[in-house]
Amino acid sequence: MKIFLDTANISEIKEGIDLGLVDGVTTNPTLISKEAGGSKKYAEIIKEILKIVDGPVSVEVVSTKSDGMVEEARKIHALGDNAVVKIPMTDEGLKAIRKLSQENIETNCTLVFNPIQALLAAKSGATYVSPFVGRLDDIGQDGMQIIDEIKTIFNNYIIKTQILVASVRNPIHVLRAAIIGADVVTIPFSVLKLLIKHPKTDEGLTRFLEDWKKVSPDGKFII
């Protein structure tokens, strides 16, 4: 399963890359607006992310009409070969996805909340579908259940559209996505850090270092 970072923060992206754990990045206008300010402009941030990330980088359109979405998508696509255009799951969005698919521009259908929406996006030619599991949890549903259902539907019909699990809130979401067989999970940097940490790991490391001081009182490596 691929891991994308859901952020527009350059420092977070660079640290994730240094860890060897970042296969791509997803952004949205909210995330980018948090970083845009002072000398940094919206487009500059997008260009910088596209430059430092080898994998796919999702950048969202803001138009609500298909013609506007397509126009914005072409501009996003021109910024880099790894740019993926995020298109909302609406009737106008589906029209745009179909058109962009015909132009070989990769798309990520966002704001998906049920399996049928995912199927429709795939039929329109979306490269990725992004079901928002955390937001479904917020209203009392089991967000990960729809990932399981989407996976079953896509397997039934050998659909190549990739399942990109979004709105991830915790490591359990990541675990369940991996067990189900989702193609990608996009996570905040804070969740990435939680995946690495475990109290027993910290406890074991502390014990090893304490025991090492019995061999080398100053703690230095002596080989």
Swiss-Prot record:
Primary subcellular site in the record, as a coarse category: cytoplasm
PANTHER family per UniProt: FRUCTOSE-6-PHOSPHATE ALDOLASE 1-RELATED, TRANSALDOLASE
Top EC class of this enzyme: transferase
Enzyme Commission number(s) from the entry: 2.2.1.2
Residue spans crossing the bilayer: none
Localization per record: Cytoplasm
Biological process (GO), any one: pentose-phosphate shunt
Role according to the record: Transaldolase is important for the balance of metabolites in the pentose-phosphate pathway.
GO cellular component: cytoplasm
Catalysed reactions, as listed in the record: D-sedoheptulose 7-phosphate + D-glyceraldehyde 3-phosphate = D-erythrose 4-phosphate + beta-D-fructose 6-phosphate
Active site: 86 (schiff-base intermediate with substrate)
Example GO molecular function: transaldolase activity
Protein name per the record: Probable transaldolase
Keyword terms, alphabetized: Cytoplasm, Pentose shunt, Schiff base, Transferase
UniProt similarity note: Belongs to the transaldolase family. Type 3B subfamily.
InterPro entries referenced in this protein's UniProt entry, alphabetically: Aldolase_TIM, TAL/FSA, Transaldolase_3B, Transaldolase_3B/F6P_aldolase, Transaldolase_AS, TSA/FSA_arc/bac
Biological pathway: Carbohydrate degradation; pentose phosphate pathway; D-glyceraldehyde 3-phosphate and beta-D-fructose 6-phosphate from D-ribose 5-phosphate and D-xylulose 5-phosphate (non-oxidative stage): step 2/3
